Amino acid sequence: MAGENPTASEYIQHHLQNLTFGNHPEHGWSFAHTAQEAKEMGFWAVHVDSLGWSIALGALFVWLFRKAAVKATSGVPSGLQNFVEIMVDFVDKSVKETFHGKNAVIAPLALTVFCWIFLMNLMDLVPVDFLPRLFQVITGDDHAYFKVVPTTDVNVTLGMSLSVFFLIIYYSIKVKGVGGFLGELTLQPFGKWMLPFNLLLEGVGLIAKPISLALRLFGNLYAGELLFILIALMPFWAQWALSVPWAIFHILVIVLQAFIFMMLTIVYLSMAHEDH
């Protein structure tokens, strides 16, 4: 938004708007130039920035861990190898303490979830104007939208939580069978005579799992990003006085939210493997 003096409201709205590509009723397939155009593109519009950054950070995770694995030695680890081993040991210990079934997929899944979400959350520490302004310079569009924190997009967090939800359903049916899975939904906690009430109660609890996973991660990171944006509106001296302490505190939020998402994923999948 160079060349203008936007109001505080316009500045905030601009930073919270995604780079959106979709089929506009009037302009056809194109990038949205306003928030209204993005809204008019409907459900099938794509948030290009969220998608791009999430894929790029996922690829970075794979590259870093593959590099550490290729260069791993039997001696005392150092540098990247040491960091990767600490992460693997931490996640492996968390899985062993929490997951009570037998499934070789759970530990790699938990490691992927934790590291991927951590990297996406970490983008919140990049100065709020740096990458968006760089993108505007590269594209030559001073009004271009560009969000760099994928987990501040509810579509990303909901997509991840739905993936966990489908795994819960899959393993519940695989371990307990269709009858056992349906029995959990209809025969608990009050027996067969209260089947409709059981289904309502258990169904709501099941659906609440992915929704709570998604909204918890989204809400915390969205609030953090909003505070960074508000700090950026302050005088230069105030930005330094407030942004550094908030960034230090926000590091805890970044790690904690990745850890919570990982642990709840392990817990939910452990429950799916319990055959009563």
From Swiss-Prot:
Transmembrane segments annotated in the record for this chain: 45-65, 105-125, 154-173, 226-246, 247-267
Q: Where in the cell is it found?
A: Cell inner membrane
- Which Gene Ontology MF annotations are present? proton-transporting ATP synthase activity, rotational mechanism
Q: Which CDD domains match?
A: ATP-synt_Fo_a_6
Q: What is the protein's major site of localization?
A: membrane
What family does the database annotate? Belongs to the ATPase A chain family.
Write down what this protein is called. ATP synthase subunit a 2
| UniProt organism field | Hahella chejuensis (strain KCTC 2396)
Ranked from the top, the taxonomy reads: Bacteria, Pseudomonadati, Pseudomonadota, Gammaproteobacteria, Oceanospirillales
